[in-house]
Amino acid sequence: MSTSLLFEQLNFLILVAAEAELPIAHSTRKLLMDNSCNNCQIYELYNENLKDVKTDKDWFMNKFGPQTVHFVISNTINFPFYKIVYFDLLIPVVSHTWVQDSVKTKRHLRTNMYSPNPFHLLRDCQVYISKSSFNKCEYILYSDLLHLLGGTLVNYISNRTTHVIVQSPQDPIIATVSKLTFGSFSSSSTNKHTEKPLREWKFVYPIWILYHFKMAKPLKGELATLCELDMQDTSEEQLFAKWEEVIGDKQTSSSQLTLHPNKTLFKNHHFAISPDLNFFTPLYWFLKGFIEDLDGKVTPLSFSDDLKSVYQAFPDIDCYIGHSANSPILEKTKSIKPEIHVGNVSWLFYMFALQKFTPVSQCKLIHQPFHAKLFTSKELTVAYTNYFGSQRFYIQRLVEILGGLSTPELTRKNTHLITKSTIGKKFKVAKKWSLDPQNAIIVTNHMWLEQCYMNNSKLNPKDSRFQNFKLDDNMGWNIGQIGMDHSSLPTPKNLSMVTYDTQSISEKPPPTNDQMDQINDNTNVLSKKDGTPISSFENSIDEKIDKLQKISGEVAVTHSGDLERSFVSRPSRASFPVVDSKKSNLQKKDSNSDISMETEVFCEGHEKREEKEFTKPITEYDAPKKQEIREQSRKKNDIDYKKEEEETELQVQLGQRTKREIKTSKKNEKEKETNECHIEVDQMTNEKQGEESTGKLISTEDVTSKKDTDKFSHLFEGLSDNDDHINDEKPAVNSKYTTPKTSQNITSGVDTPTTAQTQVFMPSSGNSRLAKTQAAKRLHTDIESLNEFQKNFKRKRIDSEEISLSQDVERSNNNKELATKAEKILARFNELPNYDLKAVCTGCFHDGFNEVDIEILNQLGIKIFDNIKETDKLNCIFAPKILRTEKFLKSLSFEPLKFALKPEFIIDLLKQIHSKKDKLSQININLFDYEINGINESIISKTKLPTKVFERANIRCINLVNDIPGGVDTIGSVLKAHGIEKINVLRSKKCTFEDIIPNDVSKQENGGIFKYVLIVTKASQVKKFTKLINDRDKNETILIVEWNWCVESIFHLNVDFTSKKNVLYQKKNN
């Protein structure tokens, strides 16, 4: 029976090296299950022959996945996949004692202290490395060595800190720490007692870490004393003397690889060391000696080197070690040797841990030279939860190189909480704080940090991809699994992720002042400041208006004298977002990813911070509220969207109509001019053709004028497609409005044939000028009409959005009211569980729940869904017993099914919550007491397998008779949920052999896969189908069953071909 929720949602793997360890393994497993662990597997190493098995990451994930393994429990590291587990997947490996002590203390203890790795000499140490003494390159190297030795790096000093690493007695941190007190602070006004620190910190030189690393054993005696700070060491000569002892110590050099036998790790590899690794000289000697002791070669580079000559002199250089990704040395190196391996110091120690040379492309993000900082510490102050062991170090390093700070506790000073699941107090508190508009904290997952760094740009942490807190469902989503081999992933522009800081677009040179002025003028037609594209409908309207005004502008150029005062052309649309030139320049500037040199001192229980640090609003990113409201209303209101589509259609029709009328008007004017020529010709020749033509043209104009009733139909009048003064782009602009000519268009547009006399008598220039002048005069009215149309259109759209917004506000207020009621009811409990159940109900709760109870369940992590949808990722079923309903049968296909519970769980839970008893510490409801009888752990565990029940039985295609009770749709959906790929419905009365589909037997090795599988309801159907198949394919295997056979297989999640129950006919290979 479960006694606590200590290991809730956590998965464990217990490794047993010898049979004698089995009792302790089962005892540990029982302890884990009693404290609510999600899953615990026992793997007997002594029964497995893994010598010929490639135990790589894929093997481990397939063997023990797909869900994340949070902890591996083993008293030894002598198993073949230790390095994959600990260094690659970043899964802590702890002894059995960790479980026992964690249960005793009721908290997850630090995993380093319980590591079975003998090289973790500093497992009991919490070390602060002074940022005043060391530059960023040295800080990275020392922290990497500390992590490799199992120590814990802290960026604050507390009473748990054991060591402080400094370079000299003059380090300012020494004076700061010596003044620290814990408990009550001295105060003359309150006369509070001042307590002394709970421990004496040891101040040590960095050689303390180097000696541990080189000797691979604890320091004792004179060596330990040598590493401790001596306040008398005031001269550089004295400090150098200590370094020379550790660098030149032959004993330590020879024992460096005691526990790491691969002494030829860097054989055939030549390392070029970049000058941007600004090391203290003795530290460079140490690094050089480290590489050479592992059979590698080293060539230092300098900024004055002719790199081409260096690489020609040493053609075997194949590795580059540097600090900054923006170094000019690195840029030149890549151009000369594009195939070179480019890494940083962390990469060297990572390979040392793996005992294998590994290209940077197969390592972690943090193993390449670092990008410039993206954030400031005010923008990125991170707390984290639900990460263990090396995962915390990885987050700390990512945050550091992004420019931020990480803190152990969650306070109002934090800007972000990083988590991969929804359990824990930090998550609940952060979610509450996230609702505070003045000082909201953003809850996001670790993929946000990784993607920001990998893409070298600030991404929106509220993007749906970074709001996925179910990352434990897939081991491939573990932190640190995005490596440099993913560097070709899409950039933020085409990621469906919204870039929320425009200064990240810094690849292009910053715009000039003139360009910035133009950009600022065009702000009203750019995409939104948050990067979201403007809707296609707005674009289509703007494009149409642009086209009209472009035509008008071209006419205005031709007739500048007439239009100078009456028309101002619309500014052209910018094709890039607004970028602050100052921000752009700052972004482009190389900051070399400096790690903040601030020294933070945390006093537990009494954190010394100024009040303003807690109350100052933290600005994450600003999107215009008006645009946000419109975006929300578009997403939430299908009615508005349909109205917009109707308006768009009307606009297109308007464009088509105006285009036709342009053509009509244009040709009428031409024919009128031609007609005047004919009149003059008639007067000279006395012919009647001109009079007839005139009569026809007048009648055509009358018809056109009657049709011209639309308010905006005159917009294109007077603007001829063939006007010589319009440039060649004109037809392309108007091509969108071109419509096929109707018979009427053709009639009205027939040109009068011209004769030789017509060519002699050209129309007067006055008539041409008259037409153009009229067109120019109408431009005022045209633009006013357009503006009026825009206003009307926007007014309609805003009105509909306001209606939708009022509905949203009402709904939001109702939700807040329900949430408040639920919180008030739950307030009498000190602790609230997060059950993380997404469930459907069958055979119970027919009347549903009231709104307050639904909100209460939601706040406890229980969500009830009406129907089963694959996208909802359901993991629970509520039913009074095992049922044959569609929902129950499908629930056994959930990936995974975590619980099959009786409805009494909900009833008792709500009963306890609504009881009038005194305030309770926690809700005393045990999930395991409500499990449905018959759905045991063995069945639950099978839902975590990567394949479904019928898929495992090699049944992928099945034939189903059309008269099956329940209906073919329902039965078919259940079968598909459990692995059937193709379902063929047979009409038993009119069925032929060709109607029966065979099963997929392509993977058949030694027989055993039935070629024909059928589900029938009558004995007569069996006789008919067996005859059809045996007559045409008599040598093939057949399986004919009742529906009950499928149901039994689903209930057990196993197909038993040896059982004859519900099998009507079976034919196997001889």
Curated annotation (Swiss-Prot):
GO terms for biological process: DNA double-strand break attachment to nuclear envelope; double-strand break repair; nucleosome assembly; regulation of DNA damage checkpoint; regulation of DNA double-strand break processing; transposable element silencing. It comes from the Eukaryota. It holds the Pfam family RTT107_BRCT_6. Residues 572-659, 722-753 are annotated as: Disordered. Keywords: DNA damage, DNA repair, Nucleus, Phosphoprotein, Repeat. The modification Phosphoserine is found at S304, S591, S593, S720, S800, S806. Signal peptide: none annotated. Residues 2-103, 117-213, 260-352, 369-453, 829-910, 934-1049 form the BRCT domain. Gene3D superfamilies: BRCT domain. Forms a complex with the cullin-RING ligase (CRL) RTT101(MMS1-MMS22). Interacts with MMS22 and RTT101. Interacts with histone H2A; requires H2A to be phosphorylated (gamma-H2A). Interacts with RAD55. Required for resumption of chromosome replication after DNA damage, specifically in S phase. Is recruited to chromatin in the presence of RTT109 and RTT101 in response to stalled replication forks and acts as a scaffold during DNA repair. This is Regulator of Ty1 transposition protein 107. It comes from Saccharomyces cerevisiae (strain ATCC 204508 / S288c) (Baker's yeast).
